[in-house]
């Protein structure tokens, strides 16, 4: 354990890797060498940092699978960020949390739609009742004789002499 966390040991291994790469790739026109060296250095540093961390986490935690999974996901996300990707790896727990949040939001929206639909139905029923009260309904023929005091009106055939007494007559006056 001491050997894994020893800084001098880590630096000597990095120097050894760089020297090995320099001897393998002796071409001075090699343009990608610094990038390859930095990636390998980063991978080595991640290896040296993650192994002791995982050993300690496995010894101290009760649920080792979740810790290992979280460490691996964190390492891969770090590598993706170093490579310039914006995407991240998510675990099933995070996906389930997001799905629960989406389902909860959908339920809330469905409840809101249900409330609004109920209110709209109540408003339509109220408008229908108001419309029914405002519309003119035909009740058939209305007896208007009581309204104009003509209950005893007779027709021409009903008069005794056969003439209407209210019909105007010609009147001649003497001068």
From Swiss-Prot:
One of its GO terms (molecular function) is toxin activity. It holds the Pfam family Rota_NSP4. Residues 1-28 are lumenal. InterPro entries: Rotavirus_NSP4. Glycans are attached at residues 8, 18. The chain crosses the membrane at residues 29-51. Keywords: Activation of host autophagy by virus, Calcium, Enterotoxin, Glycoprotein, Host endoplasmic reticulum, Host membrane, Host-virus interaction, Ion channel, Ion transport, Membrane, Metal-binding, Secreted, Signal-anchor, Toxin, Transmembrane, Transmembrane helix, Transport, Viral ion channel, Virulence. Belongs to the rotavirus NSP4 family. Homotetramer. Interacts with the immature particle in the viroplasm. Interacts with host CAV1, early and late in infection. Interacts with host integrin ITGA1/ITGB1 heterodimer. Interacts with host integrin ITGA2/ITGB1 heterodimer. Interaction with microtubules blocks trafficking to the Golgi apparatus. This is Non-structural glycoprotein 4. It comes from Rotavirus A (strain RVA/SA11-Both/G3P5B[2]). The lineage of its organism: Viruses, Riboviria, Orthornavirae, Duplornaviricota, Resentoviricetes.
